A protein has these predicted regions:
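Short, exposed beta-strand/loop patches in secreted or surface proteins that constitute
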Residues: 29-31, 40, 51-56, 80
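Hydrophobic ligand-binding cavity/cleft-lining segments
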Residues: 1-37
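Short, surface-exposed coil-to-beta transition loops
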Residues: 4-6, 46-51, 71-76
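Hydrophobic pocket/interface hotspot
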Residues: 18-28, 53, 62-64, 89-91, ...
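A short, structured loop/turn motif at beta-sheet edges
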Residues: 12-16, 54-59, 78-88
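Short beta-strand segments that buttress and anchor functional surface loops
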Residues: 38-45, 62-68
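Beta-strand/loop substructures that line and gate deep hydrophobic ligand-binding cavities in soluble
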Residues: 68-125, 129, 134-140
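Short Pro/Gly-enriched beta-strand edge/turn motifs at strand-loop
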Residues: 34-36, 56-63
Length: 140
C-alpha cells in the first residue's frame, strides 16, 4: 500500500535561509552515512530510522529515502526563489507500508499528509527563529 501527499508553501524568506532551515549544510546536522548496499541490507528495529540521500542540489532539491520497521518513505523537497525574499517550497512524501499492520498503526494511510503538514510548519518556525537570531541589531 502506498500513499502520497503533496504540499506547496511560500515562505517570506530568501532561498538560502530556507535551505539552511531544512538543515543541509547546517552546523547542527550530523550524519553517519550508509552506502547504498548498507542501506538496502540493513533492517531497522523499532524506533530506528535509516535515511539515504538520493539527490542534493544546494538551494534547489533535497530528495531522500527513509526506512523504518513499519514503512519506507521517500521525500522530495524542491525550492524555487519567487523573488529576493520569497521562496516556493514543494514537499512530496510517498509512504509505502511494509505490512497491513504498519498501515493501521500509522493512522490508516494518513501519515504522509500529516508528516508533510507538520514538516512544513516546523520548517517555517525554524526559519523564523534563525532569522530572528541572525538579524542585524537596529541602528540607533
Amino acid at each position: 500500500m502506498k500513499t502520497t501527499a503533496k504540499r506547496t508553501v511560500y515562505y517570506q524568506y530568501p532561498v538560502e535561509l530556507v535551505w539552511r532551515g531544512i538543515g543541509i549544510g547546517s552546523d547542527e546536522t550530523t550524519v553517519d552515512p550508509l552506502n547504498e548496499e548498507q542501506y538496502e541490507n540493513t533492517e531497522p528495529d523499532r524506533g530506528t530510522v535509516f535515511t539515504r540521500a538520493i539527490e542534493v542540489k544546494q538551494n534547489e532539491v533535497f530528495h531522500f529515502r527513509m526506512k523504518t520497521w513499519l514503512f519506507y518513505s521517500e521525500w522530495r523537497i524542491e525550492l524555487s526563489p519567487v523573488g529576493p525574499c520569497e521562496t516556493k517550497v514543494k514537499f512530496t512524501n510517498t509512504i509505502e507500508y511494509r505490512s497491513l499492520r504498519g498501515f493501521f498503526y500509522t493512522g490508516f494511510g494518513n501519515l504522509a499528509r500529516s508528516e508533510v503538514k507538520a514538516f512544513s510548519r516546523q520548517l517555517g518556525q525554524k526559519i523564523e527563529a534563525d532569522f530572528q537570531k541572525n538579524r542585524p541589531a537596529p541602528e540607533n
